[in-house]
């Protein structure tokens, strides 16, 4: 992904206190907080890193989320493995580009996304319907 933000894309809003909010952009959507709201249309079509202002004058920097941002801010249905633990797990597990991995209990998908970033090919098995 490069260039301007598009509808359907994830965006990371960061306020003046460095609080982070992961949002999926859509033309009718609005990001609401205690500091007013920002229509998604004021982000769609702009470049990452541009400031946007809420209706109450609060400023946010809007960026494309990294894998780490997504893992930290994602909704939690299962126990999440945090970025500080993911890299050592991949190293100990000898995950490398082209490795074939069978993952049982995919859960939130944080480990799967990290192994994919390392270039592994993953087959996952999840029994719980609410994690699919």
Language model features with spans:
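Conserved SAM/SAH-binding loop
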Residues: 82, 107-108
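N-terminal auxiliary segments of SAM/dcSAM-dependent transferases
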Residues: 1-64
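Short internal alpha-helix immediately C-terminal to a glycine-rich phosphate-binding loop
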Residues: 84-101, 112
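Conserved SAM/SAH-binding beta-strand->alpha-helix loop
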Residues: 128
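Conserved SAM-binding loop of SAM-dependent methyltransferases across substrates and taxa
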Residues: 108-120
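Conserved class I S-adenosyl-L-methionine
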Residues: 96-107, 123
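Short alpha-helix immediately C-terminal to the canonical SAM-binding loop
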Residues: 132
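Conserved SAM-binding loop and adjacent beta-strand
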Residues: 3, 72-87
């Amino acid at each position: 992904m490069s260039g301007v933000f598009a509808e359907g894309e994830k965006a990371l809003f960061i306020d003046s206190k460095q609080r982070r909010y992961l949002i999926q952009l859509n033309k009718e959507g609005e990001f609401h907080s205690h500091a007013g709201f920002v229509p998604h249309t004021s982000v769609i079509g702009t470049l990452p890193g541009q400031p946007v202002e809420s209706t109450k004058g609060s400023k946010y920097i809007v960026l494309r989320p990294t894998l780490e941002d997504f893992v930290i801010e994602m909704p939690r249905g299962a126990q999440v493995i945090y970025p500080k633990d993911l890299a050592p797990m991949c190293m100990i597990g000898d995950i490398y580009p082209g490795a074939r991995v069978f993952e049982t209990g995919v859960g939130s998908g944080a480990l799967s996304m990290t192994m994919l970033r390392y270039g592994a090919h993953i087959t996952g098995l999840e029994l719980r319907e609410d994690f699919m």
